Swiss-Prot record:
Belongs to the RASGRP family. This is RAS guanyl-releasing protein 4. The phorbol-ester/DAG-type zinc finger mediates the binding and the functional activation by DAG. It is found in: Cytoplasm; Cell membrane. The keyword NAD does not apply. The gene is RASGRP4.
Amino acid sequence: MNRKDSKRKSHQECPVKTGGRGRPRQARRHKTCPSPREISKVMASMALGMLNEGGCSEDELLEKCIQSFDSAGSLRRGDHVLNMVLAMHSWVLPSAHFAARLLTLYQEATGSTQELRRLQICHLVRYWLTQHPETMHQDPQLEEVIGRFWATVEQEGNSVQQSLGDFSSRLSPGGPGPPHPMSSPGLGKKRKVSLLFDHLETGELAEHLTYLEFRSFQAITPQDLRDYVLQGSVRGCPTLEGSVGLSNSVSRWVQVMVLSRPGPAQRAQVLDKFIQVAQKLLQLHNFNTLMAVTGGLCHSAISRLKDSHAHLSPDSTKALLELTELLAAHNNYARYRRTWAGCMDFRLPVLGVHLKDLVALNEAQPDRLPDGRLHLPKLNSLYLRLQELAALQQQHPPGNASEDLLHLLTLSLDLFYTEDEIYELSYAREPRCPKSLPPSPFKAPLVVEWAPGVTPKPDTVTLGRHVEQLVESVFKNYDPDGRGTISQEDFERLSGNFPFACHGLHPPPCQGSGSFSREELTGYLLRASAICSKLGLAFLHTFQEVTFRKPTFCNSCSGFLWGVTKQGYRCRDCGLCCHRHCRDQVKVECKKRPGAKGDASPPEAPVPPTPVPQASCGSEDNLSYTLSLEPETGCHVRHAWTQTESPHPSWEPETVPLPAKASPPTESSKLNS
């Protein structure tokens, strides 16, 4: 290396040039325009500078708002400060107290020289109710103070002031509202719109999930966000709790749909389909549902399924890893934030991340300065973030939604399983291997349930409405001739949309014709949904009081069935035996025998061995499901997707099954007859 090359190399390795006094020179932006967010921040800071450098008192803030109006009700200058005060005052001052101060100022403004001031106060109150009508409806105390204010205006004000208090002038804009779903095909059309999960296109499923997500996100009000930030919980905020519950329901629905398949290859097909759905959600910029779907796919109960993941293609595995990296919590969701900032069209945020930002901003700065004045920069920062979320609620999702598919998804998401049940099903599908397994290629599970414990369950009325909507959609598309029935083949396919809810609950065909009526399908879905949603109705066993000819033990308490006749109960389908007082506490699912008859077998007929609670077993074996949880074997297994086994011939709609919870499976057994 010669001397010239050495100098050139030393210049290349030289650090960034520094300015005077050893300070690094800041990078300059050449020929670039500021972003809209930067412009809004500068405008807001300029407006705040007109008030005070760091803050102002409550009286000064009220005076500034009053002076924003002229005699005609027009704004004299920009409305940023006014809107910020009206939207954010409730964070530091109750709205009823704020309105009471305005009432006091109105009463103190007496004399002919104060008519303009009174008129300005009336314009301020009217503007407040026009721009923020929800505040009065959600605060009874504020509504009472506002009523006293307008009553005072009616008594002491002039005709112009009284006209502002007219009820017709108090507008109540409700926003654009949720998008209108696309109308379903009419009865006269001779084609079917598929309501089957296997037939749904990934893009179609992603669009409908986006519609449900946007409808839930659009219902959240600024008051809900304020209550969450100040209280630290979604309790007491129905709309926010519903949004959180929807995300958690989608995540668990993904897990249950994967685990509903009996074989590894079939589970891999569902995994691959949901990976494609996640990619479509990313294209739609629906990050909240994307977080839920990806979180469900990366949940440890799913990622541990080595045999199932072995059937995935390398491209699918790579796509899942990329989605996991995108939504990972590393560096405060840095990759998600960069992707979010680059989205310009329709987009839905990860609500938990943005609520976390609001909480951090609220906790980082005080509400008031040491001298008692309000800290306006903090209120303005919170206001700007709330405005960003409010602007997102004015969007319109791309595409149209089918009302029928929305009914199907709504009822599917109503079905609820606990975390323990999902884990137990995962271990039942692929039991633990005693040999050491290679480490999982997936990252740590995403934190999807940012509000743990939020698992809203639909009440009976809501569930019934969802079922009626779905039945209407089913007959609209699968009975175009209006005969009032659907075929058994269509019913078998439809039942596969609901993981585990339909297992063992197939009603008899209508009048033996091999078809199902509207009433039968409604009753079937109500029972299946109630079972899966844990609303108090259980179906696992069909017990019948019998007389045992040989010593028999109770499956629930392991006690002996004493007596001469009718010592206990036996399930007509699986042969499980128990005491009269134990039949409501049986915790073993009903596994129907291939040769089970509808009527009870003779008392002297042999009964398969009934297991008793084992002494010791891992927690992963404590099964509590309404379907067979046996690992994959060569035996015949009924499957809700493939419908490989015909419906049970002895199902009786008038029979009310007795509640029975699930219990740990056992290895030891005792003979009973």
